Structures are given as structure tokens and as C-alpha cells.
Amino acid sequence: MHLLNKYVKYLSFLLIFFLFTICLIIFNFDYYVYSVTQVPSNNVNKQIEICCTWGSKLADGILTYKINNAKPEIKELVLSALEYWEQNIQGIHFKEANNREQVDIKISFRHDNGKVAGQTITSSDSNGFIFNTHVLLAEKAFGKQLNKNMIEYIAKHEIGHALGLGHANFKESIMSSLVYHSHNEISDCERKAIAEANKWKLIDNSSIPKLNKNKVYLLC
């Protein structure tokens, strides 16, 4: 009986490990950490990580979105962030999804006053292409009310993740993992990184999705 119990526990451990591994394969989790106490190293080449590539959802150049749980004035901040990205990248347009359309980028606000001011969950298919993302934002985090400028800044950052970018290793980028509110603009580096992430559509102008396996980061 003792050996049987140990065997059952071992099988349970293997099952949990297997399920956890599957989750890591299916979902790419990005957590935005609010911090102003650390500074990325300036002793390395400036670069932005290229995380993911959109698949067939981007074939027409349009990504649909839906904003949930947002007050009207807060929703305007998110719309402004989406519009800003659209103005700064060629070949991608955002469209609010109607009730009959699938949502490519779901944007929701959490109200738990937790320790995450922004988070993007990217779901990929079996071929490794993005098929939808879920952006989580907050009005309050770390016991503090975030002002409108900060909420819009974080929205821009998370939308960058939704488009396929990882983090930048330098503070002058809106994709920096740390908060530098003075760097609130999209530069050529972010534009080029988005294009490289979705090269099949934005550079090659192809109708067939293809992963850009040769690019894991872009030097700025």
C-alpha cells in the first residue's frame, strides 16, 4: 500500500508537470512590472526582442479589438494608444470587432489593485503563429491610482507586445521593461521591430504566413 501511494503521487506529479509544460507551449506570458528603481545596462548594444509573429489573422492587414470593463474616459486612452500605433506602423490597421467577428486583441481592465499594471497574454497556434492576444490593464496598481498619462503609456507598451514585440534593453524605448514616462513615443526601432516580427506581411507583402526564425531581436 505504501508503494502504491508513492506511485500514485509520482503519477500525479508527472501529470501536473505535463499540463504545465503544455501551457508554456501554448501561451506566452508577458508581465509588465512597474518599477523606477532599476536602470537597464548601457554597456550592451541597444536592442528590442522580437517575440512572436501574427498568422493568417493579419493577412488582410486588419486586427480586430474589443475593450471591456473600461470607463468611457479610460476607453478613450486605449483608443488613443491604438490610434498612435496605427499612425506609426504601415500595413496594420485596428478595427473594433462587432458581435459577429472574432476578436484578435482583447483589452480588459482589472480592478483588483494588484501588483501588475499591465500584462499581455499571447496565444499561439500549433505552428507558432499568434492567433489572439489578451491585454490586461489597470487603473490602480501597487496601492496607487495610475494617472491618465501613465495608463495610456502602459497601453502603448502592452499593444507593442500584442503586435509581436518583447522588451527593449534600454530605457529610451517605449518597450523598456521599466517605466520611463518621458520616453512615450514610438521610434524607428519599434517600427522596424514590428516589421521584422511580421516580415511575411509587412516587408515581403506575402499572403502566406511565415515565421521569421532568423530574428530574435533587432539592434537599434
Regions found by a protein language model. Give the residues of each.
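Metzincin-family zinc-dependent endopeptidase catalytic domain
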Residues: K75-N169
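Divalent metal-coordination and catalytic microenvironments
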Residues: Y65, W85, H157-G160, M175, ...
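N-terminal Lys/Arg-rich, disordered targeting/topogenic segments
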Residues: M1-Y7
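Metalloprotease/metallohydrolase-associated module, dominated by Zn2+-dependent proteases
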Residues: T21-Y31, D125-M150, G166-C220
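Disordered inhibitory propeptide/activation segment of secreted metzincin zinc metalloprotease zymogens
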Residues: N5, S12-I74, L82, I121-S126, ...
